[in-house]
Curated annotation (Swiss-Prot):
Its EC number is 6.1.1.24, 6.1.1.17. Belongs to the class-I aminoacyl-tRNA synthetase family. Glutamate--tRNA ligase type 1 subfamily. The gene is EARS2. It is found in: Mitochondrion matrix. This is Nondiscriminating glutamyl-tRNA synthetase EARS2, mitochondrial. It catalyses: tRNA(Glx) + L-glutamate + ATP = L-glutamyl-tRNA(Glx) + AMP + diphosphate; tRNA(Glu) + L-glutamate + ATP = L-glutamyl-tRNA(Glu) + AMP + diphosphate; tRNA(Gln) + L-glutamate + ATP = L-glutamyl-tRNA(Gln) + AMP + diphosphate. Keywords: Aminoacyl-tRNA synthetase, ATP-binding, Ligase, Mitochondrion, Nucleotide-binding, Protein biosynthesis, RNA-binding, Transit peptide. It comes from Gallus gallus.
Length: 502
């Protein structure tokens, strides 16, 4: 067992190495994504390694499938780990429940050095201590009773088969450390806490032991984690000292809060990544939003790509202020990134395929002309609606149903707008049959204004209202000229002719 503690493990890793260590007690949410993202961009900027380590030592709270889902969501977000339970790597296994022998060996080493001791206090005694402290309006803490057991007393209790845990001896006089975000810090943990449990009775470690042992043996050079662990860092540094190991550099990330300053609640259900993926949000939009609301960059800027986040990230610019998240802005972030996807030919091809599937899914039980599923038509829809939609699925909403199925509009509906339905219809049919190399919105707008002048009494706004209803069945939407360009001359003629013959 002692061989498992050889320090060559820590020395074997070279270069910058960071880790994201989620607990699979739930699924990946925006707070976790932000921690993972800062680790990822820091590693990629420095040509380092991004490690995913599943911290599943609290077995009673592990949610089935959560560990796999977390790794899936990192891939979906575009920030996949270089080493992980799924990908493997030179410092595996990357799941703490599979590393129990290592933690037991580490606790034995501390026991041998006198830096830790076995505690035989029962849960009942610990509960009495807690209640007594609360009754006296004090913070509950362990009274370190078993720290003073003699070797003989320990041997007698072991011989009796009593349950025990391993506690770490907290020492006074901790050394200050320089946090990458919060600057110089130290917390005299021995003055406010009892000796902490590092190995439980079931053989599983607590976070304090597991994270120190794993960060050392996995060669982690920088630990970027949530600010809730800042006050525990002095305790972890005492553990490093007891082992005789060099600690990594620490940087604690400020909290991600709701825009009103309240805590993000996992119970809300609306901060989990799977929900955003199912609703059609682009991962780039989420990455952009959670960095835009915080710090780490020279200036706030919407629309950053992952490559830009990597190149522009400055760890020294992370502030201690909490980041306020305004989820109401997410559709705008998504609109910007969706526009960029549409403009990029390679990314646009993927959107075309996704939109074709959406149309078949939403309108498959209706009479859909096969031509509307053709690549050229779908691509034109995307290019013309670029900048006007926040989600791809917007294009299969009721407002855009006219793009995929022919509306049911009667002559009577149009006559309520203008009595010149036949005249206007014939003028438009004549315009559509006129030869033209390319129909453009600008040219059609000019032609439609010219047509209106040929009517007897129909105003331009009324003519547009009539044509919009005839072509789309809608009273609002894109300009009539855009509708006509999108549908094409043949489809426009078909829809106008259908109304005239009804």
């Amino acid at each position: 067992m002692a061989g498992m503690l050889r320090e060559v493990c820590g020395a074997a890793a070279s270069g910058l190495r960071v880790r994201f260590g989620p607990s699979p007690t739930g699924f990946l949410h925006l707070g976790g994504l932000r921690t993972a993202l800062y680790n990822y961009v820091f590693a990629k900027q420095q040509r380092g390694t991004f490690v995913l380590r599943v911290e599943d030592t609290d077995q009673g709270r592990v949610v089935a499938g959560a560990a796999e889902s977390i790794e899936d969501m990192l891939h979906w977000a575009g920030i996949p780990p270089d080493e992980s339970p799924r990908r493997g790597g030179p410092f595996g296994p990357y799941q703490q429940s599979l590393r129990l022998d290592l933690y037991r060996a580490a606790s034995e080493a501390l026991l041998d050095r006198g830096a830790a001791y076995r505690c035989f206090c029962t849960p009942q005694r610990l509960e009495l201590l807690r209640k007594e402290a609360l009754r006296n309006q004090q913070t509950p803490r362990y009274d370190n009773r078993c720290r003073h057991l003699t070797p003989k007393e320990v041997a007698e209790k072991l011989a009796q088969g009593l349950d025990w845990v391993v506690r770490f001896r907290l020492e006074r006089g901790v050394e200050p450390f320089q946090d990458l975000v919060y600057g110089w810090n130290k917390h005299e943990v021995a003055e406010v806490e009892g000796d902490p449990v590092i190995l439980k009775a079931d053989g599983f470690p607590t976070y304090h032991l597991a994270n120190v042992v794993d960060d050392h043996h996995m060669g982690i050079s920088h630990v970027l984690r949530g600010t809730e662990w800042l006050t525990s860092t002095s305790k972890h540094l005492l553990l490093y000292k007891a082992f005789g190991w060099d600690p990594p550099q620490f940087g604690h990330l400020p909290l991600l809060l709701n825009k009103d300053g309240s805590k993000l609640s996992k119970r809300q259900g609306d901060i989990f990544l799977e929900r955003f993926a199912q609703e059609g949000y682009l991962p780039e939009a989420l990455l952009d939003m959670i960095t835009n609301c915080g710090s780490g960059f020279a200036e706030k800027q919407m629309g950053r790509t992952l490559e830009e986040l990597i190149s522009q990230f400055e760890i020294g610019r992370i502030t201690t202020h909490s980041a306020l998240l305004d989820l109401e802005k997410l559709p705008e972030f998504n609109r910007m990134h969706l526009t960029r996807h549409i403009e990029n030919e390679g990314l646009r091809q993927k959107l075309i395929q996704e939109l074709q599937l959406l149309v078949e899914d939403v309108y498959g039980d209706q009479e859909v002309d096969k031509e509307v599923l053709e690549k050229e038509y779908v691509e034109q829809v995307l290019l013309l609606r670029k900048g006007h939609i926040s989600h791809l699925k917007d294009l299969v909403s009721d407002n855009y149903s006219y793009l995929w199925v022919r509306p049911s509009v009667s002559r009577e509906q149009l006559q309520m707008i203008s009595a010149e339905v036949d005249e206007i219809g014939k003028l438009v049919l004549g315009l559509m049959t006129k030869p033209a190399a390319v129909w453009t919105i600008e040219e059609l707008n000019k032609d439609l204004r010219s047509l209106q002048k040929q009517t007897r009494e129909t105003k331009y706004s009324s003519m547009m209202k009539l044509l919009r209803l005839a072509l789309s069945g809608q009273q609002h939407g894109p300009s009539v000229a855009e509708m006509m360009v999108t549908l094409g001359p043949r489809e426009v003629c078909g829809r106008i002719s259908k109304v005239l013959s009804s």
